[in-house]
Amino acid sequence: MKINYSLMNETHVNGIYQLSNECFAIPWSLDSINNELNNPLAKYVIAEDLLTSEVIGFVGVWIIAGEGDITNIAVSPKYRKQGIASNLLIKLFDVCKTFNCEDITLE
């Protein structure tokens, strides 16, 4: 399996919505996801299965005044126990470093 990690863009919104419905009792709405996409404080890293083009994981952070607040993290149940969440966090930490985050916390 080949997994691509990248920043969220408009092509990922429906996949994040589907994954949110799969993983959470109270999933995010499409409007909420689009709001996050357009929020200059929010950064999201997605994991995409390159064979299926399916969004299989995501993690988000709000970066405010040098601090990163992790807002959400999810991995599809059928892809768990493969290190995807760990890799998402590593990629997210790299993003936070580019914005000079000194601290990162889980909301």
Predicted regions and their residues:
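Acetyl-CoA-dependent GNAT
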Residues: 4-80, 86-99
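Conserved hydrophobic beta-strand within the GNAT/NAT acetyltransferase core sheet
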Residues: 70, 104-106
